[in-house]
Amino acid sequence: MMFGILGTAGIGVKSVIPAVQASEHEAAAIASRDEARASAVADELGIPTAYGSYEALLADDSLDAVYIPLPNGLHADWVRAAADRGLHVLCEKPLTASADETAAVFDYCEDAGVTLMEAFMYRFHPLTERAAELVASELGAVVSVTSNFSFRLPDGADDIRIDPDLAGGSVMDVGCYAVSAARLFLGTPDRVYATTTDTRDCGVDTRMSGVLEYDSGATARVESSFDTPETQYYRVQTTDGRLEANPAFNVDPTAAAELTYATDGRVVTETFDPTDSYRREVEAFARAVETGETPRVDREESVSVMRTIDAIYESAETGAAVELD
C-alpha cells in the first residue's frame, strides 16, 4: 500500500513513517505547507516525493491511503478532503474535536467508500491485547479502572497542544488515552463528572481529573496533565483480581513491556518482547483496507471515546455531572 503523509509532525517523522517503512508498505510522499520542510524530511527518511501543499499530495494518483498527523482542529477537513480523492485514512487521535463531528466524518468516509481509522497505537500492542483478554476471561467483573497519561510540557512552549483554535488541551492530547482505556475495560459510561484547570492561561485545559460512573456500580477515574513528570498507566480492579500496565500507552518500541495481574492468590508478571505499536497499527489498518474488515478502532469506539470527552468538558464547565444517553 502506498501511503501519503499529510504534514511533518514529530509523531509522523519519529514513529509512523518509520513504521510504514518497516512494514511491507511504502511511505511514498509527504507534504508540508513549507515545501523546503517537506523536502528535508523526505531526504532524511528516504521518501520519494515531497509536496509543498496538502492539496498537491492528495492529487497524487499513485497513493492508496493517507496518514494525517495534523493539529487536532484540522483533522476533520482533511479527512473529508482525502475521502473526496478516494483515499483511505489513518488519522491521529483525537479524530475530531467532538462526537458529532466524529460521527459525521465516519458517515462521509462510508459514503465515499473509504476506510477510516483513528490512530490509537496502544490498542495494537500485545500488552494491551493481553490485558483485554485477561479482563474479559479470567479476572471477573470490573469494579474500577484508574488511568492517567500526563507529562510536562515546557513552560512558555509555543505548541499546538495548547492552542485553543486547534482543539488543544491535555484531554485532547493525552487524556483521550485514559478515556480510551476506561472504555476498553468498561465501555461507555452512564455519567461523567470532571474538573479541568488552565494553569498557563492559554485557553485550554492543562490538567483534568474525571470520574466516569456506570449503572453497574463500576467507576473509572481518568486524569491528564501537562504539568507533571511523565506518567502513563492503567489499573483495573475486578471481583476476582487486579491488573496493572505501567507504562501502558506510549511504550518504548526498543524495550520489553510488563503486565502484572493478580488472581487466585497469585501475582503474575508477563513480559512482552520489544514491539513497535505503530508498525502493528499500520499493518492492521492496511489489512482492514485490503480485506474490508472493520478496523479494531472502529466507528463505535471512536464516537464513544469522544462522547465521553465531550461530557468531561461539559461537566468541567457546568460543575455538574453529565448523563450520557
Swiss-Prot record:
GO terms for molecular function: D-xylose 1-dehydrogenase (NADP+) activity; nucleotide binding. It comes from the Archaea. It catalyses: D-xylose + NADP(+) = D-xylono-1,5-lactone + NADPH + H(+). Residues 1-22 form the signal peptide. Induction: Expression is highly induced during growth on D-xylose. SUPFAM superfamilies: Glyceraldehyde-3-phosphate dehydrogenase-like, C-terminal domain, NAD(P)-binding Rossmann-fold domains. The keyword Transferase does not apply. InterPro entries: Gfo/Idh/MocA-like_OxRdtase_N, Gfo/Idh/MocA_domain, GFO_IDH_MocA-like_dom, NAD(P)-bd_dom_sf. Keywords: NADP, Oxidoreductase, Plasmid, Secreted, Signal. Homotetramer. This is D-xylose 1-dehydrogenase (NADP(+)) 2. The lineage of its organism: Archaea, Methanobacteriati, Methanobacteriota, Stenosarchaea group, Halobacteria.
